[in-house]
């Protein structure tokens, strides 16, 4: 499998300010050698709890994974890297939601991705309204009271 991201180039572009926690799809996780990127890219494919990785992440960069739904609860930047969107849509499947609803920039080239990460502090505010709308629509139950609602629902007949 050939990665569609050049980590050497990314490192040059964004410098040592970031460490990439790379979670490849399980189909390819064992076929990727990231040893030459030690200190910059860490393969976290075998890490059991992705929610813990969200907590230590400043930005999430994803393609078509649904991870952004959970990450959006943190109200941190989400960058979509859809280098093969046309192929993905025509041969595999459509996306979960309309691209217009995505709470972050869509990048299609490595150059766009790099620029977006470098300028994240000015890019992220441009998506504030979409972010709010996205969370209202898809994460509205994540208000700190979800467990209480579940307990009440389970035990409502017992009370």
Which residues make up each language-model segment?
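Short, contiguous acidic/charged loop-to-helix segments that flank catalytic cores in large enzymes
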Residues: 43-44, 49-51, 101-104, 140-141
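Short, well-ordered alpha-helix to beta-strand connector turns
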Residues: 17-18, 57, 75
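Conserved catalytic-core segment of nucleotide-activated headgroup transferases in glycan assembly
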Residues: 1-34, 107-109, 148
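Catalytic binding pocket for nucleotide-activated donors in carbohydrate/polymer assembly enzymes
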Residues: 32-39, 66-138
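C-terminal alpha-helical cap of glycosyltransferases
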Residues: 142-159
């Amino acid at each position: 499998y050939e990665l569609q991201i050049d980590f050497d180039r990314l490192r040059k572009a964004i410098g040592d300010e970031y460490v990439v926690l790379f979670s490849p799809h399980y189909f390819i996780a064992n076929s990727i050698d990231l040893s030459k990127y030690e200190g910059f890219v860490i393969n976290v494919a075998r890490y059991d709890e992705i929610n813990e990785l969200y907590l230590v992440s400043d930005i999430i960069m994803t393609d078509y994974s649904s991870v952004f739904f959970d990450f959006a609860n943190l109200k941190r930047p989400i960058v979509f890297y859809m280098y093969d969107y046309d192929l993905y849509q025509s041969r595999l499947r459509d996306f979960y939601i309309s691209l217009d609803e995505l709470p972050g920039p869509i990048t299609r080239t490595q150059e766009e991705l790099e620029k977006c990460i470098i300028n994240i502090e000015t890019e992220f505010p441009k998506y504030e309204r979409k972010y709010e709308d996205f969370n209202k629509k898809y994460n509205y139950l994540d208000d700190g009271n979800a467990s209480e609602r579940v307990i009440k629902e389970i035990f409502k007949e017992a009370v």
